[in-house]
Amino acid sequence: MDRNEIFEKIMRLEMNVNQLSKETSELKALAVELVEENVALQLENDNLKKVLGNDEPTTIDTANSKPAKAVKKPLPSKDNLAILYGEGFHICKGELFGKHRHGEDCLFCLEVLSD
């Protein structure tokens, strides 16, 4: 193998690495977008459940009703964390908590919101 062949292989490898890096960045952006949308929809769903839970008439047939399962109420702290994240602060566990994100998305913060 001469120098030109080696150089061409290195150039092709560099182009492949650049393409993979670009695709990885696109996938990361898509994942962040999907997680943010999921968190927003979960919060909206929880709020709608609260509203519907308060407005629904309480007509329960006790003879045919099954024991109710324990309903997990959303914590208001999660709403507060979502607000902080929306204002640009880290909410993930560790030393980044409370520091400004400078407009960048953090997958760890989004994971905290999705739990």
From Swiss-Prot:
Which top-level group of life is the source organism from?
Bacteria
Q: Name one GO biological process term.
A: DNA replication
InterPro entries (UniProt xref): YabA
Which cofactors does the annotated protein need, by name? Zn(2+)
Compartment list: Cytoplasm, Nucleoid
Record keywords, A-Z: Cytoplasm, DNA replication, DNA replication inhibitor, Metal-binding, Zinc
Record's GO cellular component terms: nucleoid
| Self-association and partners | Homotetramer. Interacts with both DnaA and DnaN, acting as a bridge between these two proteins.
* Entry protein name: Replication initiation control protein YabA
Could you tell me which species this protein originates from? Staphylococcus aureus (strain Newman)
Q: Which lineage is the organism of this entry classified under, starting from the top rank?
A: Bacteria, Bacillati, Bacillota, Bacilli, Bacillales
